[in-house]
Structures are given as structure tokens and as C-alpha cells.
Amino acid sequence: MSEFTVTGTFESRDGNQPFEKTVEAPNENVARDRAFAAFGSEHGLKRTQVEISEVAQ
């Protein structure tokens, strides 16, 4: 499995906050899904509240 860096923004009380998260995944699509899942479990956010701008290996 490869390590991907996912960057973007998410909605918070203070407006949009930038983020950079590193996830292990076999490809970019799975990395994107794991980032969404992490924000959902850690912050209680819906996928529509997270905007991913880049997925890089």
C-alpha cells in the first residue's frame, strides 16, 4: 500500500479550515474515501462539508 497526502478544506464554526492528512491506501480513490471517513468519525462532518483539493502520493 502507498501513502497519500490529502489536502483541502473543511467547514467549521470559524469558516473553512485548511487541512493536510496522510492516509495509507492502494490508490487515490481509496485515499479520498478514507480521508472522508476520518473526518466523519473524528469531527462528525458529512462528505459535503469536506472539500478535497488534491491527492498526492
Curated annotation (Swiss-Prot):
Residues 1-10 have a biased composition (Polar residues). The keyword Isomerase does not apply. GO terms for biological process: translation. It comes from the Archaea. Keywords: Ribonucleoprotein, Ribosomal protein, RNA-binding, rRNA-binding. Signal peptide: none annotated. The keyword Heme does not apply. Belongs to the eukaryotic ribosomal protein eL20 family. Part of the 50S ribosomal subunit. Binds 23S rRNA. This is Large ribosomal subunit protein eL20.
